[in-house]
Amino acid sequence: MDFKKLANQYRDELLDNVLPFWLEHSQDLEFGGYFSCLDREGKVFDTDKFIWLQGREVWMFSMLYNKVEKRQEWLDCAVQGGEFLKKYGHDGNYNWYFSLDRSGRPLVEPYNIFSYTFATMAFGQLSLATGNQEYADIAKKTFEIILSKVSNPKGKWNKLHPGTRNLKNFALPMILCNLALEIEHLLDPGYLEQTMETCIHEVMDVFYRPELGGIIVENVDMDGNLVDCFEGRQVTPGH
């Protein structure tokens, strides 16, 4: 197998096909932000804007600008998405909504902590691309809010009855590990090391289960034990 040939194939497909598709079809040049619901021809079939996906696209084009090539079109795309998120994506106190309508009006309340994580990633990379301190401050403030929510990520929107089956979920330590590295330039080195050690412990010593053949389960009880229920048996291959 020719790995160099494969690497070139993937790079060419990304730079010559995938990215031009999203640059051309996903940007909402009237209201700002991005369309995420596109068919194979680039036609928009739904105009709602989800904070997860808005943040991911800001991050993607910022990261490409930072690490692949200083293309102005990539930076412009990232900045316009970042400005839309900054203006409409949160409640004024960096509690990030789950979704907005096309013009930026909130549709779903900020119940989902992963809206916060993708916003942090977005503004962390955008601050590197632009040198804009405001973007860095948004990333740091949102990260602080995430940490304050770790013990109860959904807060007042938690629909579970307290005390009956308390579980902790794999997704949060997984993404916190990734997130801390994404905003490494904004964190104290000692704090970064502590966060990484905690997350690695959670992933490798709590959710990784050698007795099940080395799989990672999505949920355990608060003491790290397996739970024989739907949630306890859940495995997410993408994680």
Q: How does the language model describe each region?
A:
Residues M1-H239:
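Glycan-recognition and catalytic cores of secretory/periplasmic carbohydrate-active enzymes
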